[in-house]
């Protein structure tokens, strides 16, 4: 088992929770980004910097993640790719992507994108990351990792 982080947009608090979980449970962790990331101590932490470009980090994660791995991402299309190949994906706010929910999440993402593109709605994006988001993620991660490690 390995934890993959779509690191470009992952909140720092989520990364810190993941580093602690990786160390505590002795699970390898890989951050993937298209820019250099701060160094993180620990023999189980790896950073991969991919070329700059649309979906390059997502493609790397989708190609390298195994069905026994956990992918942490806010990117719904990447999560859909992981779930389609039998993998496990969790968003940084603690919501598990599933075969049942991924279609609806993709449709909502596409609808909101289209509405923004046509000017029917302004702004967009999620609310600022909060302490309750952090706590929800930590709780979901803990139960998910324990369940995955028991397999």
UniProtKB/Swiss-Prot annotation:
Q: Tell me which domain of life the UniProt entry assigns to the organism this sequence originates from.
A: Bacteria
Q: Which family does it belong to?
A: Belongs to the UPF0178 family.
Q: What is the protein named? A: UPF0178 protein GSU0171
């Amino acid at each position: 088992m390995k934890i993959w982080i779509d690191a470009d947009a992952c909140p720092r608090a989520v990364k810190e929770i993941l580093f602690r979980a990786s160390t505590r449970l002795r699970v390898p962790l890989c951050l993937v980004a298209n820019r250099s990331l701060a160094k993180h101590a620990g023999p189980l932490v790896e950073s991969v910097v991919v070329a700059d470009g649309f979906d390059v980090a997502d493609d790397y994660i989708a190609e390298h993640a195994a069905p026994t791995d956990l992918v942490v991402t806010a990117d719904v299309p990447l999560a859909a790719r992981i779930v389609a190949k039998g993998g496990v994906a969790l968003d940084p706010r603690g919501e598990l992507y599933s075969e049942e929910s991924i279609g609806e999440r993709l449709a909502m993402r596409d609808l909101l994108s289209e509405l923004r593109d046509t000017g029917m709605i302004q702004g967009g994006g999620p609310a600022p990351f909060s302490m309750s988001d952090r706590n929800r993620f930590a709780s979901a991660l803990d139960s998910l990792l324990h369940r995955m490690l028991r397999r």
